[in-house]
Structure formats: C-alpha cells, structure tokens
Amino acid sequence: MAQKGVIYILTNPSFPQYVKIGYADNVESRLKQLNNSECIPFAFRIYATYEVEERLTDLKLHALIDQLNPNLRSIDEVDGKKRVREFYAMSKEQAYSILETIAILGGRKNRLKLWELSEEQRKDVELAAEIEDEHHERIIIPFITWIKSYP
C-alpha cells in the first residue's frame, strides 16, 4: 500500500462532547498545527487513526455521518457565512466504532490504530473535568437555584 495518510479522530478536553474527524498526510504535523492556537485552553489529542490510500477520504466519512444524523456536525454562521466544521457531537468511542465498522467491512482492520494518552495528557483531561465540575457547582447550580426561587 502506498499510504497517502490517515483519517483521524481527535479529542480535546476543552470540549469533551465533540470529536474532530479529518484527514492528514501526517497526523502528528496536523496535531502540531492545531495545537499552535492560543484560543483553546487544552491541546488536541490523537484518539485513533485509520490508514487510507486516497487523500480526503474523510469527506466520504463526513457525508456518511451527515446522512445518518445531520445534527451531529458543528455548523454555525459567522458574518453571514455558513461554517461547516469537522467537529461532531459524539463520544470518541462512538466515532471509533464508525471507523472500526468501516475497517472491518473493508477487511482492513489492521490499518486502524487506537492511540494511548501520555500521563501528562491524562492529567490535562482530569483537570479539564475538574474545571467543568467546579464551573457547574459554582455558577450553574446557584443560578438554577436563584431562578427557581424567583417569584
């Protein structure tokens, strides 16, 4: 196989309810590119990759997911322009299951790789969860209590 690249599943503790599904010739380079942004509190992590022979094979996967449930994809409008993103409201396990099914059906499960988090990445995931819990306890719960007590 003359490998062209991979379809990847990326996660980010900053928004754990989404995964990013895309294509890259070199997933480590793509990861560095995404993580150069100062706009996201935590870095992206590679959850899984699937080796493909054709570039932009992820577009076919995006189309499949959109057909199954068009509400999963992150789509918004900024300055009158529609932005269709590679982010999907699903768990990393659900995204992996889709890739795994495709790999099995194609007889290419050996091209599928589940990546391990480093200890530092695990700590970041835990920290992000703690921050989310603290935000919920400090802001959301008191706000809901206040709303309920309002005459």
Describe these PLM feature segments:
Residues 1-151:
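Non-catalytic accessory segments flanking enzymatic or RNA/DNA-binding domains
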